UniProtKB/Swiss-Prot annotation:
Single GO cellular component term: nucleus
EC number: 5.6.2.3
Organism of this sequence: Xenopus laevis (African clawed frog)
Entries under Gene3D superfamilies matching the protein: P-loop containing nucleotide triphosphate hydrolases (3.40.50.300)
Cofactors that this protein relies on: [4Fe-4S] cluster
Catalytic reaction(s) noted: Couples ATP hydrolysis with the unwinding of duplex DNA at the replication fork by translocating in the 5'-3' direction. This creates two antiparallel DNA single strands (ssDNA). The leading ssDNA polymer is the template for DNA polymerase III holoenzyme which synthesizes a continuous strand; ATP + H2O = ADP + phosphate + H(+)
Protein name: Fanconi anemia group J protein homolog
Keywords: 4Fe-4S, ATP-binding, DNA damage, DNA repair, Helicase, Hydrolase, Iron, Iron-sulfur, Isomerase, Metal-binding, Nucleotide-binding, Nucleus
Described function: DNA-dependent helicase and 5' to 3' DNA helicase required for the maintenance of chromosomal stability. Involved in the repair of DNA double-strand breaks by homologous recombination. Involved in the repair of abasic sites at replication forks by promoting the degradation of DNA-protein cross-links: acts by catalyzing unfolding of HMCES DNA-protein cross-link via its helicase activity, exposing the underlying DNA and enabling cleavage of the DNA-protein adduct by the SPRTN metalloprotease.
Subcellular location: Nucleus
Length: 1231
């Protein structure tokens, strides 16, 4: 997608999109706009990687901003209307007439009291106001007089109209500054004859001030003679609405819910990309993620509440700093968080400001336009109450909502053990005994006693279901009768709610002690007891709501089980033998009773959202099958969408495998999975896939039980060891700490990123586990996903069994799905969620392998898959056929990926320095081009280019050949052969062998053609600058050499198609000398550009990547003679890599010795006289030499010096080191 900002207008709303939208994104935004504008609910499925989160954010926020824009326009229009109403002539009703006359009289008195005012202006103003009052009085008299209008003379009616026109004309003149001398006194006297006016005038003369004080009362009263009464009523309603909504109608907030906090972090990263990144936002999270107190590491919820209550006299100092970051303006303008932020940024800011991030995020919700939170914050009524979340007339978006049914059922359910109930009972009993809020605690104590006694009575009625597990189930009506016997009814439950609210409320009591106030905090119940009581009352609230409407949706189950606990081993005081000290505790099996209130209808909890929210949007990549959401949630989704994927069908391999490598049928039912044949066949299949597909592979199993069985079997047979030889094998843990899980994930990512002897990693996980939900395995992190079987829920689970029976019971009257169909849908959603871990963006590719014969034999299992998966699925009857197809797919995609990595690199911009790292052009033909200066260009011919008509400086294109010669053979002629050849060489040979071949190729080039020096060499020599490399470790130097090798290898793989390498590379003697010199020169430029230790800066000449052009081989006649024998070696100071005391080792004698050796090598004579320059060195000197030799391989010397004879180099450097050391040694040691 392009990075250019795109603009779309959908539903009358302008949407700014950060890139060109996919068709699926446009379809999603269209559906969301329809739902928001029409207040309808949406059910939208878009495959993972199709950009649904971006579409959700941009469309919802654009709609919200459009409402703010409309609100601003309405406010401006209202102001204009009010201004127009103020300019209109005053109302002619009695109340306004009296107010107008009083205002006139007051103004007359003010004008009379002002002596300096001009008389003409005063008279005009007074006359003007008086005339207006008189006209209003006359009009009022026409309404109040007993005479009919038909009996009035025509002259008076015409006179009235004339006066109105005259007064209007005068008002306009007054506004222009014109002054009048009124001569219509006779007319004024005629108007005074009206009785109504005389009465009002007399009253104003007698008590002017009282009339002014009473004018407001008359003007505020209702009036039936004009429209002002209706206007006042509307104004009162508007003012009331403004007061209720905070001075202006509120724009709906957007509550964006996801399943985990990690998904919230991904959403905020997407929001940062958009044009709406500066939106006012907040993230609601738990104390576990936001607490910044350094002394609290565990049980943060309880410890936070204790610090807030300050039971030990010390309160939380971070809580008192919330005001530093509790407003949106503070974040944006003072602290610089002006774009979408993550919860980690808020926590970091809280630590810096010593302010609580948990309470700051809650305070920021008041002014936020979009609120991010896990969606159980929206479904659970207790969390909504504690977080003060109001969803009335708000927009609710639930992403990754494929598990929303299960989450809704869990939020309306409650479970507790008999031990928890007895703990709450004893604590309440203690409160009553100490006389603390006795009237409120006693009813709650009675409830706890009743439940614990009932559990003890029913313990003998339990029915055994399996080994050491018994239970009994009651339906809604039965449990209501049981609660009625306990005294908990529709009438008494509201009173119990009042008692619970009173006991959990904090209270302080002030007493006087020795004349001083003493504040005593009244004790409250512990958080554990409060949690038990609140959960119990939550269920009771649903049971008694709306005349027991949801009673049939509940089942109450009492279960008996056994668990192992660690109990301290207390020695017997009367015991004769002493026990060992190391024996601290003993494990003991105890019986546990669990009371479960299970909600079987998700619509119970979801009804709070559907009845209050303006629009609900459910979206996920795996909503299919979508038919159950409307019936299960009790919400009509008027807008539904099932979008297509954005990838091409060639980027994904989807196949079903029904047989293993040995031909055994694979059907992952409970009976088959218990056999060793099935377990061995699955292991052999997984091993073959690991050998075929490189990088990361995910394998999903139906349950943790099956995972443990397979691991034990494979460890016994040695297959687990075989898997570890190919890939790093990681197993998903069941439960455990979050930090441990994150470490395992990081281990998996690192094994793929830093591949050594092993080719990636294998992660074996479980459907519905942590790995299958919301984690991003893009690109190499998941090149294949293997699913074994169909992850049906445990059919023996009591809750699953009750849910199936419930659906069968209410399928006809409520439209629910039958129990068997609901059971299958749960399996499909879990399977689709696991398959969605692969293919995370448009350019991604991967294989989806479904291992189970049921997919091939029964088509109904294919219909449950996502739309984009079932369109591409292929059935393979044998494993060999599937493996061949998978191998071909993997090779093709790897070749395409390598080609796209070359094609997708950015072209270098104009003016790029030659010292920067070169990037590949958009074609597979790679050529390094030397841009000569004007002095050199006169010896060259211009290069013809068929791809560009823009005139460019003369250039000489120099392709690579040393690497290709080192890797052997004739150059491949097409891209596929080049890439496959390089891939095989790279995997077959280690890095050491590649470096050896590189040095050999340069050695050949140097030994054969070192005497042929051209003007290019002189030019580079004259412009080369020496630079001092920085000191680095051997590991860094090795990585730099690998960078150089990769650059040269990429040039080899690309230059093979240029056509200029059609000659055999094994015949070096037939290659043109000038061409080989050009090759050496290009390699020199590569070493300068690729290895960051060296900086070959040239002001006029630089090496850069240019578009492909025809190769022009420079002829000898085009180049001037080179009369200089000086070497063009790029000088670097090797002493920086020696010890601190070994500085300044190079001397004039060493240079002479080097020149003599070079002359001998250039003349082709054997180097036999170098022994005269060599001295014996110690072990320390040999180590120093090895360091310098390694640096020379990395580019410390000229490209030609890489091929220098090793024996000559060793003796030469030994001589240099020994001589320099002798110079630096004190004469005391030399004597």
């Amino acid at each position: 997608m392009s990075s250019v900002l795109s603009e779309y207008t959908i539903g009358g709303v302008k949407i700014l999109f950060p890139c060109r939208a996919y068709p699926s994104q446009l379809a999603m935004m269209n559906s969301i706009m329809r739902g928001l504008n029409c207040k309808q609910h949406c059910l939208l499925e878009s495959p993972t990687g199709s950009g649904k989160s971006l579409a959700l954010l941009c469309s919802a926020l654009a709609w919200q901003q459009s409402l703010y824009g409309k609100q601003l326009v309405d406010e401006k229009s209202d102001e204009k209307e009010w201004k127009k109403m103020e300019r209109v002539t005053p109302c002619c009703c009695s109340c306004h007439l009296k107010n107008s006359d009083q205002t006139t009289f007051s103004s007359d008195r003010q004008m009379n009291s002002t002596d300096n005012a001009p008389s003409n202006i005063s008279g005009a103003s007074s006359n003007k106001t008086t005339l207006a009052s008189k006209l209003c009085a006359k009009k009022q008299a026409s309404f109040t007089t007993d005479q009919d209008d038909d009996f009035q003379t025509d002259r008076k009616r015409i006179r009235q109209s004339h006066d109105e026109q005259l007064q209007a004309r005068k008002r306009r003149c007054y506004e222009k500054g014109v002054q009048f001398i009124d001569d219509d006194d006779d007319d004024d006297r005629d108007h005074v004859k009206f009785d109504s006016y005389n009465q009002r005038r007399a009253s104003m003369d007698s008590c002017a001030e009282e009339a002014i004080a009473a004018s407001s009362n008359h003007s505020a009263g209702p009036c039936s003679l004009c429209f002002c009464g209706q206007t006042k009523e509307e104004d009162k309603a508007t003012e009331k609405c403004k007061k209720e909504n905070g001075e202006k109608p509120k724009v709906p907030k957007i509550f964006f819910g996801t399943r985990t906090h990690k998904q919230i972090a991904q959403i905020t990263r997407e929001l940062r990309r958009t044009a709406y990144s500066s939106v006012r936002m907040t993230i609601l999270s738990s104390r576990e993620h936001t607490c910044v107190h350094p002394d609290i590491h565990s049980n943060r919820n309880e410890r936070c509440k204790e610090l807030l209550e300050a039971k030990d006299g010390h309160s939380c100092r971070f809580y008192h700093g919330v005001h530093k970051m509790n407003e949106q303006s503070l974040l944006q303008y003072r602290h610089g968080i002006d774009k979408a932020w993550d919860i980690e940024e808020l926590v970091g800011l809280g630590k810096r400001l010593r302010a609580c991030a948990y309470f700051a995020a809650r305070e920021l919700m008041q002014g936020a336009d979009i609120v991010f939170c896990p969606y159980n914050y929206l479904l659970d009524s207790q969390i909504r109450e504690s977080m003060e979340i109001c969803l009335e007339n708000q927009v609710v978006i639930l992403d990754e909502a494929h598990n929303i049914e299960d989450c809704a059922r869990e939020s309306a359910s409650f479970s507790c053990s008999d031990e928890q109930l007895m703990y709450a009972r004893d604590e309440i009993d203690s409160m009553v005994n100490h006389g603390i809020r006795v009237s409120d605690h006693e009813p709650l104590r009675a409830v706890c006693y009743s439940l614990t006694n009932w559990i003890r009575q029913c313990s003998d009625q339990l029915v055994e279901r399996e080994y050491e597990a018994s239970c009994k189930v009651w339906n809604g009506k039965e449990i209501l009768s049981i609660f009625h016997d306990m005294g908990i009814t529709n009438a008494t439950f509201p009173l119990l709610k009042v008692n619970l609210a009173a006991v959990v409320e904090k209270e302080e009591k002030i007493t006087m002690f020795h004349g001083q106030e003493n504040v005593i905090k009244i004790p409250t119940l512990s958080p554990q007891s409060q949690m038990v009581l609140k959960g119990l009352f939550l269920v009771l609230d649903y049971l008694f709501r709306q005349n027991n409407r949801f009673a049939e949706d509940y089942r109450v189950a009492l279960q008996q089980s056994y668990t192992w606990t660690n109990r301290p081993d207390i020695p017997d005081e009367n015991g004769f033998f002493a026990r060992p000290r190391s024996r601290r505790s003993i494990r003991q099996k105890i019986m546990v009773y669990t009371l479960n209130f299970w909600c079987l209808n998700p619509a119970v909890a979801f009804s709070d959202l559907s009845s209050n929210a303006r629009t609900i949007v459910l979206t996920s990549g795996t909503l299919s099958p979508m038919g159950s959401f409307s019936s299960e949630l009790g919400v009509k989704f008027s807008i539904q969408l099932e979008a297509n994927h954005v990838i091409h069908k060639s980027q994904v391999w989807v196949g079903t495998v029904g047989a293993g490598p040995k031909g055994r049928k694979l059907c992952a039912t409970f009976q088959h999975t218990e056999t060793f044949d099935f377990q061995d066949e699955i292991g052999a299949l997984l091993l073959s896939v690991c050998q075929t597909v490189s990088h990361g592979i995910l394998c999903f199993l139906p349950s943790y039980k099956m995972l443990e069985k397979l691991k034990d079997r494979w460890m016994h047979t040695g297959l687990w060891e075989n898997l570890e030889r190919i890939k790093t094998v990681i197993k998903e843990p069941q439960g455990g700490d979050k930090t441990d899980f994150d470490k395992l994930l990081q281990m998996y990512y690192d094994a793929i990123r830093y591949k050594g002897e092993k080719d990636g990693a294998l992660l074996i996980a479980v459907c519905r586990g942590k790995v299958s939900e919301g984690l991003d395995f893009s690109d190499n992190n998941a090149r294949a996903v293997v699913t074994v079987g169909i992850p049906f829920p445990n059919i023996k689970d009591l809750q699953v069994e009750l849910k199936r029976k419930y659906n069968d019971q209410h399928a006809k009257n409520r439209g629910l799905l039958p129990g068997s169909q609901w059971y299958e849908i749960q399996a499909y959603r879990a399977l689709n969620q696991a398959l969605g871990r692969c293919i995370r963006h448009k350019n991604d590719w991967g294989a989806l392998i479904l291992v189970d014969d049921r997919f091939r034999s029964n088509p109904k299992y294919i219909t449950g898959l996502s739309k984009w998966v079932r369109q591409l699925v292929q059935h393979h009857s044998t494993f060999n056929g599937a493996l061949e197809s998978l191998t071909e797919f993997s090779k093709n995609q790897q070749q395409r990926m390598q080609m796209s990595s070359t094609n997708c690199d950015d072209e270098p911009s104009q003016g790029t320095s030659s010292s920067s790292k070169n990037t590949s052009p958009t074609s597979s033909l790679l050529e390094f081009t030397v841009h000569p200066t004007q002095s050199v260009s006169e010896f060259t011919q211009p290069t013809s280019s068929t791809q560009s008509s823009v005139t460019s400086p003369p250039e000489i294109a120099i392709p690579f050949s040393p690497i290709q010669a080192s890797l052997g053979g004739t150059a491949p002629r097409d891209n596929a052969e080049v890439l496959s050849h390089w891939k095989e060489e790279q995997r077959r040979k280690s890095n050491t062998s590649i470096k050896t071949n590189l040095m050999k190729s340069f050695e050949k080039s140097k030994s054969n053609y070192s005497k042929q020096r051209t003007s290019f060499y002189n030019y580079f020599k004259s412009n080369a600058h020496t630079s001092t490399p920085r000191q680095s470790s051997s590991k860094t130097r090795e990585s730099n050499l690998e960078i150089c090798c990769n650059e040269l290898a990429s040039g080899y793989s690309a230059s093979a198609n240029s056509g200029s390498l059609s000659q055999g590379f094994g015949r070096e003697n037939n290659v043109s000398r000038k061409q080989d010199e050009g090759l050496n020169e290009s390699c020199q430029e590569i070493l300068c550009n690729a290895v960051p230790l060296f900086h070959c800066t040239n002001k006029e000449t630089h090496a850069s990547v240019s578009p492909p052009r025809k190769y022009v081989e420079p002829s000898v006649s085009m180049l001037p003679e080179d009369n200089t024998d000086t070497d063009i070696t790029i000088h670097c100071t090797p002493e920086l890599y020696d010890d601190d005391g070994q500085e300044n080792l190079v001397s004039d004698e060493e240079d002479k010795c080097n020149e003599e050796k070079e002359n001998k090598i250039d003349s082709g004579r054997a180097d036999k006289d170098t022994n005269a320059c060599a001295l014996d060195t110690s072990v320390k000197r040999e180590n120093l030499f090895h360091k310098e030799e390694y640096l020379n391989v990395s580019g410390n010397e000229n490209a030609f010096n890489i091929g220098r004879n090793k024996g000559t180099e060793q003796k030469n450097r030994e001589n240099r080191l020994s001589r320099s050391r002798n110079k630096g040694v004190s004469s005391f040691f030399l004597d």
